[in-house]
Amino acid sequence: MIEVIYKDEKQTAKGNEESFNLPKNIRQIGIPNEKYRIYIEDYVYTFLKKIAEKAEEEEKGAAAVFTGEIKWNSGTGYLFIRGALTAEAGEISAEHVEFSDLTWQKLHEEIEHYFAGQEIIGWFLTQKSLQMEVTEGVQRIHMKLFGGEKALMLMDPVEKEEAFFCYDNGRLLRQSGYYIYYEKNPQMQAYMLEKNPELNQPEQELVADDAVKTFR
């Protein structure tokens, strides 16, 4: 797999639509295509790997919801994944994911609390020995819960495989590459800290990065 690291290179997406800055410090995985450019923040990526490891230990599936924003420029969709929240949805597998009204309510409350101003832009599914392809079941779940423009990430914690999928011509198609970017992300750090109660020890003076150290 191709991996390229760029540092401190300010890039701007320019076209017919409004221009916007791209992340400066990035790591390219694979070869991103021209229709969709996926940027996932490193704290988010670290959190997802931890979810996958825990799911493997507990021998069950797990899901999360992505927050961030989607921008379009010159026919290219730019997905900026800035946050991720675990989805408590009962039994989860590649054939069954069901979000109850209570699940959605909790997710929206947490988004408002931790990731205010961001929108749901996709979801994450992990399971032991999960195939890196979209089955009819996964396609059905995606369309029912999220809809076309949203992205999907699959991760197999055993084989250490992962892949992004975006909706195109009526199907979720695997993306040939994506970017991991690095920047301060206090919203995600706060969420990660909240999900690690063992860090809340009164005798210690904690900083937000302790959450990430625990995950990594």
Predicted regions and their residues:
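N-terminal beta-strand/alpha-helix entry module and adjacent surface
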Residues: 1-121, 129-211
